[in-house]
A protein has these predicted regions:
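Conserved N-terminal structural module of periplasmic/extracytoplasmic solute-binding proteins
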Residues: 92-164, 170, 178, 349, ...
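Short helix-initiation/N-cap motifs at beta->coil->alpha
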Residues: 134-142, 160, 226, 303-316
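A structural signal for short loop-to-beta-strand junctions that line the ligand-binding cleft
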Residues: 152-153, 181-215, 243-244, 351-354, ...
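Hinge/lid segment of periplasmic solute-binding proteins
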Residues: 159-208, 220, 225-231, 342-343, ...
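Short, solvent-exposed loop/beta-turn-alpha elements that line the ligand-binding surface or hinge
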Residues: 176-184, 265-288, 335, 347-355, ...
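Extracytoplasmic/periplasmic solute-binding protein
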Residues: 199-203, 208, 229-278, 320
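Glycine-centered hinge/linker elements that transmit conformational signals in sensory
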Residues: 232, 275-305
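C-terminal lobe and pocket-closing loops
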Residues: 328-339, 348-444
Length: 470
């Protein structure tokens, strides 16, 4: 029976936490500094404690003042130095010290069981046990754990954390051999490049596409937003309760492919690194894209408000012919019996849509003493046709980063053939920490422009200014 298993967060063991909190490595300095008062005297020492000269069963005002000042100073220092220790005590036991002879991985809960045969072989070959866990707050727990020298050896997450975690010093860079570099798709390596180093192992790529209902849509999917008004009328004529298209148009993520189609960009680059001061969300192409979206709202093709859950629900009920979404939406459509296909996101001004490409990545914990072992497991067990096929069976990966497997899977799966075209036409989402500025600023701009509070140009220029100055 393999030791690989999915575990839920372990209940906190109070006695164990107390032992962890009191343990200090041999030769290490005390965690708390010596608390001192004026003149360098220790406030915890008894040598300086003497009564004021006016002590006659009471203290004079000056004596009370000095004692009060000392107490406040002691209190502030205690709070300052005890909060990090308190955080350490509150860390769940799954974030505690490393286990000898064991490799720990934080993983997607839907994929862990599928890897058991691969893990069993690794355990038999090496004698090293592999433990899979799926914390609910994987990214937050990982960042907190690494800061105190703990956590898993490997964590699987999207590439949007590359810059943040690399700059914070919580993930380790990897040395990529020419052989390994040639095995994986170039666009996958682009996602993990930051400040001249590679910060993780790419696993798979995915993007949004135009998902269309083959029953409702007769003929080829539209390539331009400008086609949708006439197409909507045509669909309604045959299917009165249906409309042509719906997506979460106020989402920076789902609408970006339209705005980027005519040349908008998030950040420019200086050599190979992103320049967060070179912002391209208010270009003429971006303005044209947002103007087209607003035209569809005014024409009644799109509703005046929308949520993503509504989009999925309407598509599953055949109330819309098309939506913009990703592979995560496929299972619900399959379950609902929808016969669907994929096409590139439509664009503006004759250009195809250019959506974001996301890459799932295996990161190495910089604090881990097992980095060599983790690299061995990832390079020779996971990034193989057998390993990635097992992961895909647990939950669809999208386009595997491994070229040999990508070619085989795409050849045999029509949906993956269509998704591959969308990935090839997309752009890798920026991986620097400042990308969060983009999502919040552009999201606000889309909201105020689509509800008529600002023109597309004014809204996007404000978003660009906010991205530069935050």
């Amino acid at each position: 029976m393999t030791s690989a298993r999915l575990t839920t967060p372990i209940a906190r063991d109070r006695s164990r936490l107390l032992r962890i909190g009191s343990r200090r490595p041999a030769g290490a300095k005390a965690i708390l500094p010596r608390l001192t008062g004026a003149g360098g005297q220790s406030l915890c020492s008894t040598s300086h404690r003497r009564r004021p000269q006016s002590w006659n069963g009471a203290l004079n005002l000056d004596g009370w003042s000095r004692i009060f000042d000392s107490a406040v100073h002691l209190w502030s220092l205690t709070i300052h130095w005890s909060l990090p220790l308190l955080a350490l005590f509150l860390i769940p036991t799954r974030l505690s010290a490393w286990t000898n002879g064991e490799l720990s991985i934080w993983f997607d809960p839907d994929r862990g069981h599928a890897l058991e045969p691969i893990i069993q072989k690794f355990e038999n070959d090496t004698g090293i046990k592999v433990k899979l866990e799926s914390p609910e707050n994987r990214t937050d727990d990982f960042a907190m754990a690494v800061q105190v020298g703990k956590g898993p050896d490997i964590v699987i997450w999207a590439h949007d954390k590359v810059g943040e975690w690399a700059d914070a010093g919580i993930i380790a860079p990897i040395e990529v051999s020419p052989e390994l570099r040639d095995r994986l798709l170039p666009k996958a390596w682009e996602a993990v490049l930051h400040r001249g180093s590679i910060w993780g192992y790419p696993i798979a790529l995915e993007t949004v596409s135009l998902i269309y209902n083959k029953t409702l849509l007769e003929g080829p999917p539209p390539t331009q937003l400008s086609e949708l008004v006439d197409l909507n009328a045509k669909i309604k004529k045959k299917h009165p309760e249906a409309t042509a298209i719906l997506w979460d148009y106020n989402s920076s993520y789902y609408s970006w492919g339209i705005l980027a189609s005519a040349g908008a960009y998030v950040f420019g680059k200086k050599e190979k690194d992103y320049d967060p001061q070179d912002v391209g969300v208010a270009t003429s192409g971006a303005i044209a894209g947002l103007s087209e979206i607003i035209s569809l709202i005014r024409a009644g093709v799109l509703p005046k408000s929308v949520t993503y859950s509504t989009v999925e629900e309407q598509m599953a009920r055949s109330k819309i012919a098309m939506m913009i979404s990703g592979p995560w939406a496929w299972p619900n459509l399959i379950k609902s019996g929808i016969d669907f296909g994929l096409a590139p996101v439509p664009g503006v001004d004759g250009h195809p849509g250019r959506p974001f490409v996301g890459v799932s990545v295996a990161y190495l914990n910089r604090s881990s003493p097992n980095q060599d072992l983790a690299r061995e497991f990832l390079e020779h067990c996971v990034l193989t046709e057998e390993g990635l096929t097992a992961m895909d069976h647990g939950k669809p990966l999208g386009i595997p980063a491994l070229i040999s497997l990508e070619e085989k899977m795409v050849k045999n799966d029509p949906l993956l053939q269509e998704l591959k075209l969308c990935v090839d036409g997309g752009e890798v989402m920026p991986n620097i920490p400042q990308t969060s500025r983009f999502f919040t600023s552009l999201g606000a701009a889309l909201q105020i422009a689509t509800n008529g509070q600002a023109s597309p140009e004014a809204a996007l220029k404000e978003a660009a200014a906010n991205m530069r100055h935050l």
